[in-house]
Amino acid sequence: MLNDIKKQRLSEKEYDENFDEIHPPLNEHEAYLEGDRCYYCYDAPCIEACPTGINIPLFIRQITSKNPEGAAKTIFDENILGGMSARVCPTETLCEEACVRNTGEDRPVKIGLLQRYATDSLMNSSDHPYKRSEDNGKKVAIVGGGPAGLSCAHRLSMKGYSVTIFDSKSKLGGLNEYGIAAYKSLDNFAERETKFVLSLGGIDYKLNTTIGKDLTVDQLKKDFDAVFLGMGLTGVNSLLVDGEDNNGIDDAVRYIEDIRQAKDLGELPVGRKVIVIGGGMTAIDMAVQIKKLGSEDVTIVYRRGQKEMSASLVEQQNAQNNGVLIKHWSKPVRLITNDNSVCGVEFEYTSVKDGKLVGTGEKYKIDSDMVFRAIGQTFEDDADGLPTLGSGRISVDENYKTSISGIWAGGDCVNEGEDLTVSAVEAGKKAAESIHMELS
C-alpha cells in the first residue's frame, strides 16, 4: 500500500521501551570499578583528544577517591555542558579512541559514562559549583542560546558581565533541546542543564527573538559592549531533484525536533516504508528514531562509501542493530510520486572517477511512504550587518573575532571545527575569554 502514513503504530508500552536510554548510567560501584581501569597517564592522549581539554585522568581519580562532585567540578571547569556532552559526544572517535587501553584490550575506559556519573552526581545533589564575580558594569549580547551561546554566557557571567541571550526559539538549548535523538537524552535533561547554567545568575534571556527580524546587529552593537553570535544552522540543503514539494518528503532536523518536543510519541505520523538520505549523525538519528516509532522498513542511502560517512562506525552499527538498512554509493535522481505524494525514490549508483563523484548510469528504485533529507544544514545570512562569510559561514580569527569590531562568533555558524556540542562549548568558552581580554 502506497502512502501508508499513520499515527499510533505502537502501544504506549512499546514507545516507552523503544525510547528508553541507549546507555544506562553507572551506579557508584560500577563507576568505581570502571574508573579503576584508568592508567592515569602522564600527558594523557585522552585529554588531547577532548575538544574542551578536560583533565580526564584527574576526574576519574576523583571518582575512584569517592569524590564525584569534585570530579564534576574538574569537568565543568572546561565544559559547563559536560552532562549533555557525556550523553551525546562521539567519545568513540575522541577521548575513548585515544585511550591507551585500546592497545592491548581494544576496550577503552568508559570515559563518557564516567563523566555522566560525575556530572549527574553534582547536578542532582549540590548547589551551583561557581560563584559569580561582582558586576563589572559591562554588558554582552549573545545571539543564540545553544551550546556555544550558553558556554559563552556562563563564562562571561562568572567574570562579572551582565549577559543577555537572544534566541529565536521558545526554549533555550539549541540542538541539545531540539536536535538530539530522544533516546540519548531523557527526562528533559537539556532543559535541566540549561537551568543549571542560568542558576549562576547574571544571565537574562529573550525568547522568540530573531536577528534580522526582531533586532539588528547595529542595535546590538549600540546597546552592548560586545556581541557574540552563536546561531545555529537553520537552513537545510536541497536534494536538487524534481518533486521535493510533494507530500511525504521532509527535513530530518524538523522531524527530530517534533520527536523531541512531542508530549505523545503516538501522535507523530510514521510511514511504513521510510528512506533517509544522508550519511551523518542526523541521518542516523532520524533513521533509528523512525524505526523506534514503528516504521517497518527504514533505509539510509548515502552517495559515498561507509568510511566516508561522517557518522561514527559505532552509530552506524547501532542503526543496523535497530533494523536500519544502509546503502552506499547511491544518489537520488528522482522522487516518484502518486497524487502529489511521494511513493518512492529513484537512485543512481555512484563511483569516484578522477577524484570526482560521478553517476554510473545504473539506476534502481526503492518504494517509500516518507523521505527525509539529512544532507547537511546551511547558515542563513539574511540579517543585515552580519560579519564577512567564508564557505557559507561566518569567518573568525583564532580568537573568534569577526570582521566587525566588537563582534565575536562561534559554534555551528562559524567556518571552523566540527559541528559537535563539545566543539561549540569550546568555541563559546574561548570567545568569552577573548571578549574579557578585550574589555578588561
Predicted regions and their residues:
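N-terminal Rossmann-like FAD-binding beta1-loop-alpha1 element of flavoenzymes
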Residues: 139-162, 283-291
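FAD-site-proximal beta/loop scaffold in flavoenzymes
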Residues: 245-271, 355-419
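A conserved FAD-binding loop/helix module that cradles the flavin
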Residues: 413-440
